From Swiss-Prot:
Native source species: Human papillomavirus type 63
Keywords annotated in UniProt: Early protein, Host cytoplasm, Host G2/M cell cycle arrest by virus, Host nucleus, Host-virus interaction, Modulation of host cell cycle by virus, Phosphoprotein
Family as reported in the entry's similarity comment: Belongs to the papillomaviridae E4 protein family.
Subcellular locations according to the entry: Host cytoplasm; Host nucleus
Gene: E4
Biased composition (Acidic residues): 51-68
Name assigned to this protein: Protein E4
This protein's GO CC annotations: host cell cytoplasm; host cell nucleus
């Protein structure tokens, strides 16, 4: 046996090669390190001064005006009308016809192959 990496075929081309971890990441200059510390400290100091975006101020719910009520379209009632039954019957008929065609095709294929179900 050899100590080679496993071969994944074309899938191996899609995987990114792994790099060994770096022992010591480069250090930032002192000024940038201080700046980073200062901003995190300032964020912690001033975090409780006001509402955050998540909380937001409470806004009372305003009822819609008469004009908005007039412009709002009326919801369509969902009832079993003639179109629904017509569409359902048509779809049932088409599905039944397709099922018969598929069954006939399979019977023909079985017959050609000499398979008797």
């Amino acid at each position: 046996m050899t100590d080679r990496a496993p071969h994944y075929g074309l899938l191996g081309l899609l995987q990114t090669p792994t790099q060994p971890p770096k022992d010591n990441p480069p250090k930032l200059p002192e000024k940038q390190r201080r700046r980073g510390r200062d901003t995190t400290r300032n964020r912690r100091l001033f975090a409780s001064d006001g509402p955050t975006d998540e909380e937001g101020p409470e806004v009372p719910e305003i009822p819609p005006s008469d004009e908005e009520k007039e412009n709002r379209p009326e919801p369509l009632p969902v009832v079993e009308n003639g179109w629904h039954s017509f569409l359902r019957e048509t779809l049932e008929h088409q599905l039944g016809r397709l099922q018969r065609e598929v069954n006939q095709d399979f019977e023909d294929l079985y017959r050609r192959l000499g398979i008797h179900p």
